[in-house]
Swiss-Prot record:
<dbReference type="InterPro" id="IPR020601">
    <property type="entry name" value="ACP_carboxylate_deaminase_bac"/>
</dbReference>
<dbReference type="InterPro" id="IPR027278">
    <property type="entry name" value="ACCD_DCysDesulf"/>
</dbReference>
<comment type="similarity">
    <text>Belongs to the ACC deaminase/D-cysteine desulfhydrase family.</text>
</comment>
<keyword id="KW-0378">Hydrolase</keyword>
<dbReference type="InterPro" id="IPR001926">
    <property type="entry name" value="TrpB-like_PALP"/>
</dbReference>
<protein>
    <recommendedName>
        <fullName>1-aminocyclopropane-1-carboxylate deaminase</fullName>
        <ecNumber>3.5.99.7</ecNumber>
    </recommendedName>
</protein>
<feature type="modified residue" description="N6-(pyridoxal phosphate)lysine">
    <location>
        <position position="51"/>
    </location>
</feature>
<dbReference type="GO" id="GO:0030170">
    <property type="term" value="F:pyridoxal phosphate binding"/>
</dbReference>
<dbReference type="Pfam" id="PF00291">
    <property type="entry name" value="PALP"/>
</dbReference>
<dbReference type="InterPro" id="IPR036052">
    <property type="entry name" value="TrpB-like_PALP_sf"/>
</dbReference>
<dbReference type="InterPro" id="IPR005965">
    <property type="entry name" value="ACP_carboxylate_deaminase"/>
</dbReference>
<comment type="subunit">
    <text>Homotrimer.</text>
</comment>
<feature type="active site" description="Nucleophile">
    <location>
        <position position="78"/>
    </location>
</feature>
<dbReference type="GO" id="GO:0008660">
    <property type="term" value="F:1-aminocyclopropane-1-carboxylate deaminase activity"/>
</dbReference>
<comment type="function">
    <text>Catalyzes a cyclopropane ring-opening reaction, the irreversible conversion of 1-aminocyclopropane-1-carboxylate (ACC) to ammonia and alpha-ketobutyrate. Allows growth on ACC as a nitrogen source.</text>
</comment>
<keyword id="KW-0663">Pyridoxal phosphate</keyword>
<dbReference type="GO" id="GO:0009310">
    <property type="term" value="P:amine catabolic process"/>
</dbReference>
Amino acid sequence: MNLSKFKRYPLTFGPSPITPLKRLSEHLGGKVDLYAKREDCNSGLAFGGNKTRKLEYLVPEAIEGGYDTLVSIGGIQSNQTRQVAAVAAHLGMKCVLVQENWVNYSDALYDRVGNIEMSRIMGADVRLDSAGFDIGIRPSWEKAMADVVESGGKPFPIPAGCSEHPYGGLGFVRFADEVRQQEEELGFKFDYIVVCSVTGSTHAGMLVGFAADGRAQRVIGIDASAKPDKTREQVLRIAQNTAKLVDLGREITAEDVVLDTRYAYPEYGLPNDGTLEAIRLCARLEGVLTDPVYEGKSMHGMIDMVRNGEFPEGSKVLYAHLGGVPALNAYSFLFKDG
C-alpha cells in the first residue's frame, strides 16, 4: 500500500491521541476494553474533526491550481462546512457554503448557533437552502460554484463529507496507519474499530487502511443516515476507488463493508432515547462529549453491542470520535435538564 505518493498539506497537530474509556468499560461490565481515537482533538482549526483530516489531501490541488474560493455543502449544522470555512481562512481563500435543511428539527436558534455560527464568524458566505437530506451531488452546490465563476472567481469544489472527491478516502487510510503505529506503542492490536457512517468516505478510507493488515471486516460502521442502502453503496464505491489509488493489492468487495443499521433512527439528525442516553452516559463517566447527529449514534451502537455481548470477552474496541460536538448548542432544548 502506497499513500506517500499523494501530496498532503498538514492541517492537524499530528497523530490524534488514543485514550482509554476506563470508567465506561467498567460500567458496562469490564469484559470489553473500550478506547477512543480523538479526531475531535486533531487540529487547532475551529475544533477540527474528521473532515480536517480529509482536507489535508484535497487542498494541495486547490493551492497548486490557483483556486481562490472553497465551495462546500452540508446541513445547517454541518461539521464539514465549519471545517472547510476554517481551512479557507487558514489558507487565505474565500469560502462559499451551501447549508441545506437536512434535519427535520425546529428550534429558533438552530441556524444561528454551533457550526453555522462559527462559519459566519470565520467569514464564510453562508447560503441557506430549503432542500432536504440526501446523499450525492446537489443542485444547490453546483449553482453556488456557477455563481463564483460568474463573479470572476475560481471555485474549488468540496462535496459533502469530501466523499465524492476522488481523494476523499485518503485521510482515513492514513488514520489506519496512525493506529498501527500507536498499537506498537500500546503493545496490543484493536480487535474492532467502531465508526459513524453517512456519506461514506471516512468509513471507506478506514476500511481500506485496515484491509492492509486483514482487519477490513473489523471496521464496524454505524449508520446515521437512515438511508443505509445509499450509505452502503457509497462506502463500497469509495473504498474500491481508494484501494486502487493506494495500490492496496486486493479487491474490496461488498462483504468487506460492515454497516450496522440499528441506530440511525428516527431519521438523519434526530436522536432517539438510546442516542441521548449514550451521550449522557459517556459525558458523565468520561467527560467526553458526543453529538445527537453522528457520534451519539455511533456511541449508542458501541454501548449497545457491549451490553448485548456482541464483542467477545476480552476484546479491545477502538471508538473513532470524529468530532461533531459544536452542533450540541443547536440541540440545547433536548438537554435543558442535563
